[in-house]
Amino acid sequence: MTTIVLIWDNFGPMHDDRVRAVVKAYGKRARIVGIELFGKSDTYEWDNEANTEFEKVTLFPGMEAGSVPPLTIAARIVSRCRALKAGHVFLCNYDQTAILLAAAALRLSGRGVYTMACSKFDDLERNITREFLKRFFFLPYQGAISSGVRARDYMRLMGIPRDRIASEYNTLSIDRIRALSGQQPAPQGTPFADRHFTIVARFVPKKNLAMALDAYELYCQTAERPRALHLCGSGKLEAMLRAKAAEMGLADRVVFRGFLQSDGIAQALGHSLALILPSVEEQFGNVVIEAQAMGLPVILSDNCGARDKLVRSGVNGFVIEPDNPEGLAFFMGLLDRDEALWRRMSASAGTFAEKGDVARFAEAVQMLVPAA
């Protein structure tokens, strides 16, 4: 029986979802092990829950990225994979030195090595020479799990053959989200008139939250009874955003919820009219899956990778430019006023949710490593 190892920096709810799905898909035909490098995330405040449903190993308990030298990390990855007699290893963060070293060593030892990523060419301004040199980081990999259209194309640019790129990478358990919400997905559940707009994001520049507040101000100027805007998240821009909302006279309508764990997000979305994601840079946007699990239309920027497969403008949401607050305000007003439109989009969002379900990730793993 082969052993398949899935490695991430730190396990949050989405990683637990994915490993559980792979365990379920393979059954007794493979041993599945999840490895997290560090016991703490240096980016997210999510709960790192105790797990009893699958084998999980933490290489550096109580530590976070940046606290351990790359060579030490690589050596620990290789050592543990050898001890587990891993036949196939899936790794994230191909651009990190430790991952490159570990992937190369594992490939040279005869193991199947695969990368998992959702980077897109349009994530930032690219230098062609640098992109060509970056292909070196992909040499150890025999395949990849990616997302959408643009991320898959980027994997091809990096030298991964088209027929060795599986999808979808960015996935969550739809059942878990709905159970955590404690509510029926829209259009059932909370009445239309009682719903608010919601943004779930870190308070950092690339999330474009200042533009979202500009759009919300424009929306409030034309709405007969403006709905509240809930901001779920935390970060270095919080003080600035609070001050901006106050200066606009919107302090009583903009609700700062703080960082929410998975259950809090699911519950907030259960009372929402729509999710807003106006990022200037967004590799994917996993919260889109959470929103669709709860039947919500999504208004997001065309920079977001999730729009490739999950959002169809005018069908289950709207796509905007990240520098267009007038457009965002227009679509907010449209959903606010037109309950029939909202209900149609809500029903469509619910059907699209399956495209982001964690079962798609398990299918991707099975495409690259067929069960015996």
Language model: regions and residue ranges:
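Short hydrophobic beta-strand element within catalytic cores of glycosyltransferases
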Residues: 297-301, 311
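Conserved donor-binding/catalytic core segment of Leloir-type glycosyltransferases
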Residues: 188-216, 230
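A short, histidine- and acid-enriched strand-loop-helix "catalytic/donor-clamping" loop
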Residues: 97, 111-132, 140-143
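A short, well-ordered alpha-helix in the C-terminal region of glycosyltransferases
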Residues: 334, 341-355
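Conserved acidic donor-binding segment of nucleotide-sugar-dependent glycosyltransferases
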Residues: 313-314, 318-325, 333-339
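Donor nucleotide-sugar binding/catalytic pocket of nucleotide-sugar-dependent glycosyltransferases
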Residues: 139-185, 191-192
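Aromatic "clamp/platform" in nucleotide-sugar-dependent glycosyltransferases that forms part
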Residues: 280
